[in-house]
Swiss-Prot record:
Its EC number is 7.2.2.11. GO terms for biological process: nickel cation import across plasma membrane; oligopeptide transmembrane transport. The keyword Iron does not apply. It is a peripheral membrane protein. Gene3D superfamilies: P-loop containing nucleotide triphosphate hydrolases. Residues 2-241 form the ABC transporter domain. It catalyses: Ni(2+)(out) + ATP + H2O = Ni(2+)(in) + ADP + phosphate + H(+). This is Nickel import ATP-binding protein NikD. Belongs to the ABC transporter superfamily. Nickel importer (TC 3.A.1.5.3) family. It comes from Escherichia coli (strain K12). GO terms for cellular component: ATP-binding cassette (ABC) transporter complex, substrate-binding subunit-containing; membrane; plasma membrane. Keywords: ATP-binding, Cell inner membrane, Cell membrane, Ion transport, Membrane, Nickel, Nickel transport, Nucleotide-binding, Translocase, Transport. It comes from the Bacteria. It is an enzyme of class 7 (translocase).
């Protein structure tokens, strides 16, 4: 399995250019946070990595490398990169139980799909009464439960990399904290490389090792998390950090 995945000069276009020359490097055991405002190109960059671009959007330049060798996004999805989506409800077939979803995911990737394995993954993400959860349909579960189930599926994939696209969006504060605890636990126990897409600098401060800031489809600043919080250079980065510090009655040093 690869130790590093690199996005090199990715460009995306629809009727007009959307993403311009984006380069990112994911490394095993490190969390790279991709931050920026809505419409900055974060989710499109993830979609390009996984080969799931929306209709009408095409990649016009760039390549993806695994340990320095060119690779197709389709060869990465699921096997080498597990995904935790922004809206978990849209990721599940409403006609299938959690057991069916989990089992089919495992079988598609050639992983063990016995009930003991599925139960262990569900228990690992803190969902109580795994036998009952496996019988549930998506509409019978809260957003927080579905997000935990997505994380359980990522655990079942045993992929060396994870893309987590706004994993705490639309969750209450308690559910957000639990999801962050789970992601932190996965990093400690399995040490995958993680691309964490978020607009929440509090999430960045807690989980990230490195940060890339996007604005208008471009990476405008990139570096380790401590440097970006203490000495942000670009105006977009300064605005993000200042807004985060203001929540705690603090100001960014001039």
């Amino acid at each position: 399995m690869p130790q590093q995945i690199e996005l090199r000069n990715i460009a995306l276009q629809a009727a007009q250019p959307l993403v311009h020359g984006v380069s990112l490097t994911l490394q095993r055991g490190r969390v790279l946070a991709l931050v920026g405002g809505s419409g900055s190109g974060k989710s499109l960059t993830c979609a390009a990595t996984l080969g799931i671009l929306p209709a009408g959007v095409r990649q016009t330049a760039g390549e993806i490398l695994a340990d320095g060798k060119p690779v197709s996004p389709c060869a990465l999805r699921g096997i080498k990169i597990a995904t935790i989506m922004q809206n978990p409800r849209s990721a599940f077939n409403p006609l299938h139980t959690m057991h069916t979803h989990a089992r089919e995911t495992c079988l598609a990737l050639g992983k063990p799909a016995d009930d003991a394995t599925l139960t262990a993954a569900i228990e690992a993400v803190g969902l109580e009464n795994a036998a009952r959860v496996l019988k549930l349909y998506p509409f019978e579960m809260s957003g927080g439960m579905l997000q935990r189930m997505m994380i359980a599926m990522a655990v079942l994939c045993e992929s060396p990399f994870i893309i987590a696209d706004e994993p705490t969006t639309d969750l209450d504060v308690v559910a957000q904290a639990r999801i962050l605890d789970l992601l932190e636990s996965i990093m400690q126990k399995q040490a995958p490389g993680m691309l964490l897409v978020t607009h929440d600098m509090g999430v960045v401060a807690r989980l990230a090792d490195d940060v890339a800031v996007m604005s208008d489809g471009k990476i405008v600043e990139q570096g380790d998390v401590e440097t970006l919080f203490n000495a942000p250079k670009h105006t977009v980065t300064r605005s993000l950090v200042s807004a985060h510090l203001a929540l705690y009655g603090m100001e960014l040093a001039s």
